[in-house]
Swiss-Prot record:
Subcellular localization: Plastid, Chloroplast
SUPFAM superfamilies named in the record: Ribosomal protein L36 (SSF57840)
Cellular component GO terms, alphabetical: chloroplast; ribonucleoprotein complex; ribosome
Highest taxon in the source lineage: Eukaryota
Name under which the protein is recorded: Large ribosomal subunit protein bL36c
GO molecular function: structural constituent of ribosome
Keywords: Chloroplast, Plastid, Ribonucleoprotein, Ribosomal protein
Chief localization: plastid
GO biological process entries: translation
Protein family membership: Belongs to the bacterial ribosomal protein bL36 family.
PROSITE patterns: RIBOSOMAL_L36
Length: 37
């Protein structure tokens, strides 16, 4: 899980999701998981 100021899709399988007011990226590749600060 990378925590970044700006999250973006890295590959085609990445999905942007809003959870509890935070923007997250979920992906089949675990290295692509991100969360906004």
């Amino acid at each position: 899980m990378k925590i970044r100021a700006s999250v973006r899709k890295i590959c085609t399988k990445c999905q942007l999701i809003r959870r509890k007011g935070r923007i997250r990226v979920i992906c089949s590749n675990p290295r692509h998981k991100q969360r906004q600060r």
